[in-house]
Amino acid sequence: MNDSEFHRLADSLWMTIEERLDDWDGDSDIDCEINGGVLTISFENGSKIIINRQEPLHQVWLATKQGGYHFDLKGDEWVCDRSGETFWDLLEQAASQQAGETVKFR
């Protein structure tokens, strides 16, 4: 994967997250902000999830209250380089825990 392909795929992730949160109709307040390639999801309780891209490594990094995760593209899924869990699974788990209700991005 070259740098432009990496950015295209990361942009697609960001867009999906932003669209899902724009359509969010849950009880808790969840905001999303993109600044300089970093996507920040802010929750009503003051907690945050930070997602950023690591261009030199062609990885997407996810920081949650539970910890930090690094994802490599394998086929058409971003997969954690330690646990093997997918980006979407870990993001949904963290967002649901931090929101206090089920949050889905897929």
Swiss-Prot record:
Q: Which GO terms describe its molecular function?
A: ferric iron binding; ferrous iron binding
Query: What's in the keyword line of the UniProt record?
Result: Iron, Metal-binding
Q: Which InterPro entries match?
A: CyaY (IPR047584), Frataxin/CyaY (IPR002908), Frataxin/CyaY_sf (IPR036524), Frataxin_CS (IPR020895)
The answer on whether this UniProt entry bears the keyword Disulfide bond reads: no
Which Pfam families does this entry report, sorted A to Z? Frataxin_Cyay
**What's a single GO CC term here?**
cytosol
SUPFAM superfamilies in the cross-refs: Frataxin/Nqo15-like
Which chain regions cross the lipid bilayer?
Answer: none
**UniProt key word Metal-binding:** yes
Q: Which GO terms describe its biological process?
A: iron-sulfur cluster assembly
The job of this chain, per UniProt, is described as: Involved in iron-sulfur (Fe-S) cluster assembly. May act as a regulator of Fe-S biogenesis.
NCBIfam families referenced in this protein's UniProt entry, alphabetically: FeS_CyaY (TIGR03421)
Similarity remark? Belongs to the frataxin family.
- Report the protein name in the record: Iron-sulfur cluster assembly protein CyaY
